[in-house]
Amino acid sequence: MVRCKVGSGAYAANSAIGVDCPAHISTEDTMTGRKKLVGQRIAVLAADGFEKVELTAPVAALRAAGAEVDIISLKSGKIRGMNLHQPADLIPVDWTVDEVSARDYDGLLIPGGFINPDALRQSSEARDFVRAFDLLDKPIATLCHGPWVLASAGLLSGRTLTSWPGVRDDMVHAGATWLDQEVVRDGNLVTSRGPQDMLPFVREMIQLYAGGPASNGALRRRHSDPQRESPTAVTSAAMRWMPRSPIGAMLGLALLGAGVMAVSRAGNGGRISAVEARGASE
């Protein structure tokens, strides 16, 4: 069982996943105090490179609402999360995707991240797993880059959704109507832009799994919103959800960058020397 300390932003968890509760998600906010999802079993489809907060925060809310949650992946053992571009915790996998069926679950959650959905969308087993949920009209919740998986599964034609703004064109090209709003609900699908919209996403996700009506602002529209003029605001908002970088990690990134530059210079040394020699002879 996972408990969210109201207003404190701290989690106490007896599960295998250590969860950092986002500061603005409380028991009342997620409506988990009423145990809306008791008896439900939710599959979380994730691979290495999942965005940590996009898995841990929704999973904690689901468990607090009474749901049983399984982590499903492409491999057994553990998978590595990310805090944006930095490695985060390992979490244990409950089942591999070839060991389970959509019929075993009441709903599906697909977290985002840069790497995770790219790996999932290249797996035929993952695509089939996701496709089966839609075929059975079971609820699917995803955010950030997670809708990439839906696109590769061929599920977006005629749908209305949102995603990380940077993949807006991918969604439109897959046949979807893309909206630049916190959360969008279309039938059995709930989507959100990213960590900056975690609170409305979690609320709507629980409503979806519980069979409740869509909230105001989550309803579909007919035409896609335009591309953004600048990524600055939404990127900065998402960064506020990320843990502070430890000094060691920052130093490691600096050393890695220096190493890449050194290797690049060494590899280009001969070409640079030749150019310089040619210039000197002219």
Kindly label every feature range from the protein language model.
Residues 2-6, 14-136, 148-155, 170-180, ...:
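Extended, subdomain-level signal for the structured scaffold at the beginning of enzyme domains
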Residues 68-74, 143, 160-163:
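Short internal beta-strands
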Residues 137-143:
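ADP-ribose/adenylate-binding Rossmann-like module
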Residues 154, 163-164:
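Catalytic cores of processing enzymes, dominated by hydrolases/peptidases
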